[in-house]
Amino acid sequence: MSIRKLWVDMPGEIVRNVNLDVREGEILGIGGLAGQGKLGIPNGIMGLYEAGGSVTFKGQEIPLNSPRKCLDADLAFVSEDRRGVGLLLDETLEWNIAFPAMQVQSKFLKPYLGGLIKWRDEKAIHAITQKYIDELAIKCTGSKQKARELSGGNQQKVCLAKAFALEPKFLFVSEPTRGIDVGAKQLVLDALKQFNQENGVTVVMISSELEELRSICDRIAIVSGGRIAGILPASDPSEDFGMLMVSSVK
């Protein structure tokens, strides 16, 4: 993915003139201090806030300000606001996990009357939900349980499952471990790394936790003042990242 001159109008975030190249198949981290723009980048690209500039993926221009067109281009997003954006709290795990893929890709639907009518494939929906309940160790009473009734960590796992079910080629994940316990954090990070390795999916992980980024990312970009201050290998010393975070970007 190539990002050029990206700006985003998101309250509490500064994003102006972001230029960034993401390598196919890598896990790229984006870090930085609060309000400096790291959260605005994925929210702007995925159409949740007004944005401008140029974003290309696999040689195709990605239309900004259109969440549906981003999904059609095989992009997916796990938002930092899991209760406000990520989940249908009063719906079942099955509906949360399967609905986006049904709506965008017509997955988990059975055709009738030569395709004139499509109806939910309940067996397939249950199967995909159970697959992710098992793989992500989602603690629940079953696939029919409502998302509202789960703990924060398990809600986050459902958000991941929803994105995984889309089988994207490129995945943005914003603050994936925020507000969840230590054990659940590691499972979420392991799931992201496994998804990347087994499916060749490019992952961009945005996080306030530098050490979490360093644990699974190949490279880490630091955002300061709404721009990319620098990109370093994840193995570089923490002090180098700290210097970028407080740097004045010209």
Please provide the spans of the model-predicted regions.
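Glycine-rich phosphate-binding loops of nucleotide-dependent enzymes
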Residues: 1-250
